[in-house]
């Protein structure tokens, strides 16, 4: 028995654009059904199955609620496995990455919380644009390489967004 499709667990068709509020609501409903505590008096086998179902549900939810992880997953179930670590041959984006990192470093050095807020808005807009671009091409076989490039960019911006949140917390203290 293979692992069920993450989308199928939530009664969804594979697609990139998801209503994350509905996904969260459905997750909570399903989590209550398979929570291991509900099987405390069940047999050891039933407890193990409940634990496995709960873990699979958690993994599926974490994957689907994250745009970069959802993008990678969609490519994988479409037969386009993307290695985790690969050299990026995208000079324009590499230059953009360097510029963003330098700007973030300057904001940190200057302890510029307002500047960080502006940077965060620009980053969010860039993420939204990548999400739209990916949504338009992920299921077009001729555009799978483009979709992979976009997914890698999404991963970078997601990591950068985490760094921005951490910087905000440090500057806010």
Swiss-Prot record:
PROSITE patterns in UniProt: DNAJ_2
GO biological process, one term: protein complex oligomerization
Domain of life of the source: Bacteria
Keyword field: Chaperone
Keyword Chaperone attributed: yes
A GO molecular function held by the record: ATPase activator activity
Gene3D superfamilies: DnaJ domain, HscB, C-terminal domain
J domain span: 5-77
GO annotation, cellular component aspect: iron-sulfur cluster transfer complex
NCBIfam families assigned to the protein according to its UniProt record, in alphabetical order: hscB, PRK00294.1
Described function: Co-chaperone involved in the maturation of iron-sulfur cluster-containing proteins. Seems to help targeting proteins to be folded toward HscA.
HAMAP family in the record: HscB (MF_00682)
Family: Belongs to the HscB family.
Assembly notes: Interacts with HscA and stimulates its ATPase activity.
Protein name in UniProt: Co-chaperone protein HscB homolog
């Amino acid at each position: 028995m293979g692992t069920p499709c993450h989308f199928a667990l939530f009664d969804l068709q594979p697609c990139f654009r998801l209503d994350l509020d509905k996904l969260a609501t459905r997750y909570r409903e399903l989590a209550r059904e398979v929570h291991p505590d509900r099987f405390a008096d069940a047999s050891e086998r039933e407890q193990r199955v409940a634990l496995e179902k709960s873990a699979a549900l958690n993994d599926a939810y974490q994957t689907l609620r994250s745009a970069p992880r959802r993008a990678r997953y969609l490519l994988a179930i479409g037969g386009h496995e993307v290695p985790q670590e690969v050299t990026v041959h995208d000079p324009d984006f590499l230059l953009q990455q360097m510029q963003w990192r330098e700007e973030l470093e300057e904001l940190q050095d200057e302890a510029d919380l307002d500047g960080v807020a502006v940077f965060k808005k620009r980053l969010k807009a860039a993420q939204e644009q990548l999400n739209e671009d990916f949504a338009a091409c992920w299921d077009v076989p001729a555009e799978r390489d483009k979709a992979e490039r976009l997914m890698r960019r999404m991963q970078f911006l997601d990591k950068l967004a985490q760094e921005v949140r951490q910087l905000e917390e440090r500057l806010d203290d």
